[in-house]
């Protein structure tokens, strides 16, 4: 009887673990894709403001238009939701990693958390800086200073391209390293992540297409996690002490 009860408890724990892993993978995929989408939307709207190369007349006309200012302000309001989605993404990703393997480096895990936190903080600074002129004119009826109107968007772009994406590179590196070491991500994706991280870390580009690199990596990761979530058996019958890797046959539906 005691052996039967112990086996039943072990099976129940495994089933709960399987459901938890499936939920964590699904949530991670959803909020990761949501952050990528909201990030691109908010930055596209905020960067609509005239930049350093704009003439004084272009700057004056842009900020004199209420509709133009509100495009930037919509991007400003979307920005916090992108940040909230990323916070959920980081927490859910770490839950999935912790539940999927016991071979997890504390150093890599902490670096992943810290780099993700700094990345989203710098993204907030970049987007807020790029929209401060539109906000000040919209809410305080201030006058446009062309020199100031040029400086703030440049400052925002510098924070994003030079600082935020370096932290994103560290996040990509650590996520790839954790996934490769534990065997919970495909090897091609993990090694590709090292290339993406190196590109984000070393590139000196200020081109608008560069903004797409990190969100695209997130989209691919989200798609992989959705695939993983579908393959995890919610009634996983793998003893807890044996560990769990998403590639293991007992935990994966075939076909």
Language-model regions: role of each:
Residues 2-255:
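Hydrophobic, aromatic-enriched alpha-helical segments typical of multi-pass transmembrane helices
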């Amino acid at each position: 009887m005691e052996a039967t009860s112990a086996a039943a408890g072990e099976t129940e724990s495994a089933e709960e673990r399987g459901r938890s892993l499936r939920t964590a993978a699904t949530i991670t995929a959803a909020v990761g894709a949501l952050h990528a989408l909201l990030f691109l939307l908010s930055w596209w709207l905020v960067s609509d403001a005239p930049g350093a190369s704009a003439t004084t007349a272009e700057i004056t006309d842009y900020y004199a238009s209420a509709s133009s200012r509100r495009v930037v302000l919509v991007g400003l309001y979307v920005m916090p939701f992108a940040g909230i989605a990323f916070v959920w993404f980081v927490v859910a990703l770490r839950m999935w990693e912790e539940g999927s393997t016991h071979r997890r480096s504390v150093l890599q895990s902490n670096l992943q958390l810290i780099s993700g936190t700094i990345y989203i903080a710098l993204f907030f600074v970049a987007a807020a800086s790029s929209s401060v002129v539109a906000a000040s004119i919209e809410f305080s009826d201030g006058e446009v200073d062309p020199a100031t109107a040029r400086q703030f968007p440049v400052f925002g772009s510098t924070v994003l391209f030079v600082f935020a994406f370096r932290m994103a590179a560290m996040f990509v590196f650590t996520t790839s390293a954790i996934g490769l070491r534990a065997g919970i991500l495909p090897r091609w994706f993990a090694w590709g992540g090292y290339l993406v991280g190196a590109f984000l870390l070393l590139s000196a580009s200020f081109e608008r297409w560069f903004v797409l690199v990190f969100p695209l990596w997130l989209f691919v990761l989200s798609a992989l996690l959705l695939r993983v979530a579908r393959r995890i058996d919610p009634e996983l019958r793998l003893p807890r002490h044996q560990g769990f890797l998403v590639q293991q046959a007992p935990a994966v539906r075939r076909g």
